[in-house]
């Protein structure tokens, strides 16, 4: 049943960080959550060509800080920082509080599940054969140091009348191992035959010891019971 659970969700707090790190009271929680959703929706639509990996949102003291992880930071920043300033103003208007935008570059996009899935989707939309696109993505990931990768596509593959799923795997992808650093993402390709879904799993190795925050909290174990004399 390991394939039934979301690989990122089950590892939150163990080896995976959250994409939103803030605390709110009961009356503010819904507004903050709705604001996060609208900010992500806006940035995703605005930065379609920027190879967007993920968006991390923090809310320190009546403000919002957005970190954009992208493989093409120059596209996000724009000429002399004009584009990022427009994004900052738009995010501040959506969230209703002062905004700060940071850009983080993804050094190896071939090892990022979201970017790999988006790359396969763009190839399928350009009518590249799905098997060739999958194999190329798998080979690039393994060449750059991935321990394992699995790619699955589903839909009307090659324009077939009946939809089906096909997957390709190389190396190890241990979904049951919680300390395994597995990056998972979904993407979709809009072709003339319909929508093709793409799932990507990338195994980058095991993280021993867990996250630093998890290590800081020591488990409170029960004190060992004293044995009575004459008993073993």
Curated annotation (Swiss-Prot):
**InterPro entries according to UniProt:** KH_dom, KH_dom-like_a/b, KH_dom_type_2, KH_sf_prok-type, Ribosomal_S3_C_sf, Ribosomal_uS3_bac-typ, Ribosomal_uS3_C, Ribosomal_uS3_CS
What GO terms describe the biological role, i.e. biological process, of this protein? translation
Positions of the KH type-2 domain: 39-107
Q: Which GO terms describe its cellular component?
A: cytosolic small ribosomal subunit
Q: Which SUPFAM superfamilies match?
A: Prokaryotic type KH domain (KH-domain type II), Ribosomal protein S3 C-terminal domain
Q: Where is the region Disordered? A: 213-232
Task: Give UniProt keywords alphabetically.
Answer: Ribonucleoprotein, Ribosomal protein, RNA-binding, rRNA-binding
Which GO terms of the molecular function aspect are on file?
A: mRNA binding; rRNA binding; structural constituent of ribosome
Known function: Binds the lower part of the 30S subunit head. Binds mRNA in the 70S ribosome, positioning it for translation.
Q: Which HAMAP family match?
A: Ribosomal_uS3_B
NCBIfam families xrefs: rpsC_bact
Q: How does it assemble?
A: Part of the 30S ribosomal subunit. Forms a tight complex with proteins S10 and S14.
- Family assignment? Belongs to the universal ribosomal protein uS3 family.
Q: Specify the protein name.
A: Small ribosomal subunit protein uS3
The uppermost taxa in this organism's lineage are: Bacteria, Pseudomonadati, Pseudomonadota, Gammaproteobacteria, Vibrionales
């Amino acid at each position: 049943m390991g394939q039934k659970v979301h690989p990122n969700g089950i590892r939150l707090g163990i080896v995976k960080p959250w994409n939103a790190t803030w605390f709110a009271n009961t009356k503010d929680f819904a507004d903050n959550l709705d604001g996060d959703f609208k900010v992500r929706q806006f940035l995703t639509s605005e930065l379609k060509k920027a190879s967007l990996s993920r968006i991390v949102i923090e809310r320190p003291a009546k403000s919002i800080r957005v970190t954009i992880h992208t493989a093409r930071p120059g596209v996000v920043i724009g000429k002399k920082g004009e584009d990022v300033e427009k994004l900052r103003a738009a995010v501040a208007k959506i969230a209703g509080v002062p905004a700060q935008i940071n850009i983080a570059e993804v050094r190896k996009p071939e090892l990022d599940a979201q970017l790999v899935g988006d790359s396969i989707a763009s190839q399928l939309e350009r009518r590249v054969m799905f098997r060739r696109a999958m194999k190329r993505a798998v080979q690039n990931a393994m060449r750059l140091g991935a321990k394992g990768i699995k790619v699955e596509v589903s839909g009307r593959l090659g324009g077939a009348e009946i939809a089906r799923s096909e997957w390709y795997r190389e190396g190890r992808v241990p979904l049951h191992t919680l300390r395994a650093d597995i990056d998972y993402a979904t993407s979709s390709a809009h072709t003339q035959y319909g929508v093709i879904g793409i799932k990507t799993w990338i195994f980058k190795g095991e993280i021993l010891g867990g996250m630093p925050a998890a290590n800081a909290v020591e488990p409170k174990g029960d004190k060992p019971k004293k044995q009575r004399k004459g008993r073993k």
